[in-house]
């Protein structure tokens, strides 16, 4: 990939870093998957912390803090700083869904998944589920929420789309929220020559979130893969 000389120094630095780091994406995603398993899967196996326990002295509280006090805030902060690079490079659910898709049935995406209200419905259902079970206070409930979401991402990726991230575009519970924050992102990728007509949806191109790249105007669906 050639980096044009007329770009700003910052833009060229970001592009060069992204191109050079792409060969390490699989390793990064594998590490993030391991972190996900530890942060989500280990706390339910540990005993309940005593009343006098602290974050630094109790592994359950420490992992709980990593999930809700570090992981989630950094996801939203990263979107503001770098766009949705979390979704395309770091998210273990998106990576697992994409991997499942490469070995899956790759069926056409049904209309009910493409419905504009599907992401909002997904967000509402997951939020109500999490609040009802108290996922922030009960590690088992958190493991059920995130583990179930991971399973759904894999199943939907295995069933539908051809080399696409159907889960990320249409079904991720926080995808639209991150898309809203990405409008503030300091880093965005745009076509060098943009065609007229505004943003368009297409399953024919190489974009995993079905963006018609030559007509791309917005960053909300771009996962910076």
Label the model's feature ranges:
Residues 1-211, 220-223:
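Membrane-embedded alpha-helical bundles of multi-pass integral membrane proteins
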């Amino acid at each position: 990939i050639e980096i044009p000389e007329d770009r700003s120094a910052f833009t060229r630095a970001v592009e060069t870093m992204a191109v050079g780091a792409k060969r390490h994406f699989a390793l990064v995603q594998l590490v993030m998957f391991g972190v996900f398993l530890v942060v989500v899967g280990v706390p339910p196996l540990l005993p309940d912390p005593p009343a006098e326990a602290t974050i630094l002295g109790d592994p359950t509280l420490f992992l709980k803090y990593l999930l809700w006090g570090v992981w989630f805030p950094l996801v939203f902060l990263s979107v503001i700083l770098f766009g949705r690079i979390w979704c395309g490079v770091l998210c273990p659910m998106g990576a697992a869904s994409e991997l499942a898709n490469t070995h899956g049935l790759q069926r056409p995406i049904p209309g009910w998944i493409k419905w504009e209200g599907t992401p909002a419905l997904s967000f509402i259902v997951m939020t109500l589920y999490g609040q009802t079970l108290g996922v922030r206070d009960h590690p088992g409930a958190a493991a059920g929420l995130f583990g179930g979401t991971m399973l759904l991402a894999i199943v939907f990726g295995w069933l539908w789309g051809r080399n696409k991230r159907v889960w990320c575009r249409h079904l991720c519970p926080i995808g639209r929220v991150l898309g809203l924050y990405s409008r503030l992102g300091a880093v965005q990728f745009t076509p060098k020559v943009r065609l007229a007509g505004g943003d368009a949806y297409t399953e024919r191109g190489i974009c995993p979130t079905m963006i018609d790249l030559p007509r791309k105007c917005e960053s909300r669906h771009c996962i910076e893969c």
